[in-house]
Amino acid sequence: MCIRDRVKGLFRNYIEDLKQGVAKNMQNPGPYASENVSAGESGSFFDDYCNWNRIPEFEKVIMESPAAMVAAGLMRSKRVQIFHDHILIKEPGTSKPTPWHQDAPYYFVDGVQNVSFWSPLDHVKEASLRCVAGSHKWVKPVLPTRWIAEDSFYPDEHDYLPVPDPDVEGMEIREWEMAPGDAVAFNFGILHGARGNKTTKRRRAFSLRLIGDDARYVERPGPTSPPFPGHNMNAGEILREDWFPEVYRHPD
């Protein structure tokens, strides 16, 4: 699976749950919460991840919504495990874009059966997700960077492609006007980003990362994001199910 057009209404019946979860998350941020707007930039760009097991509304959406079943079909996987949740909130007038990046290089997950759902909780057009078609097939992964400092995440830069500028380089960029609860489904290897939010309304987005049958733990040349300290997994192992529970299994 690479990029699928909008999965219309995937979280439509859970919008209020997600809004409540986002509000709780912002009132009580987790250890990985970050404000991504630097000095001199306007607005606020808050993100946080790995909170589903302490915010009941997120857990409800993951366990009860059709997302895991849809993911199994997209990945052609018999089973689905949760990897992590992520919220990204851009206040009105935020100039900071979401930097172009692939998720895969940040993760300690190897395999092709994976999917990320990105779903807005507000109507979006200009501030929607943007994906570069075919980028999951590039010969090397794109260099992971820190969003604020914009420096390299790992020391071995030669193993990665430099972060491109898809607009300037004429790449095929796909983006969608989306209603609350719609979702874009894409592979961890897809290069993606988003513009700043220059509108007068908030842009709240919920993202859910799921993995399938072939997902295995892989060592990276430095701390990953999320880091999941103390996981005690070894290369080639299925991700431990007490931390990354199975949320769907196709009936035999």
Regions found by a protein language model. Give the residues of each.
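Double-stranded beta-helix
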Residues: V124-L191
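Sequence context surrounding c-type heme c attachment/ligation sites in exported
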Residues: M1
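Short, solvent-exposed loop/turn segments at secondary-structure junctions
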Residues: R4, I87-K90, P105, H123-V124, ...
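Non-heme Fe(II)-dependent double-stranded beta-helix
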Residues: R4-W100, Y106-Y107, P221, E237-I238
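Non-heme Fe(II)/2-oxoglutarate
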Residues: G21-M26, Y32, V37-G40, V142-W147, ...
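Short, conserved beta-strand element in jelly-roll/cupin
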Residues: H101, F108-K125, E177-P180, A185, ...
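Glycine-rich phosphate/pyrophosphate-binding beta-alpha loops
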Residues: D103-P105, N114, H192-N197
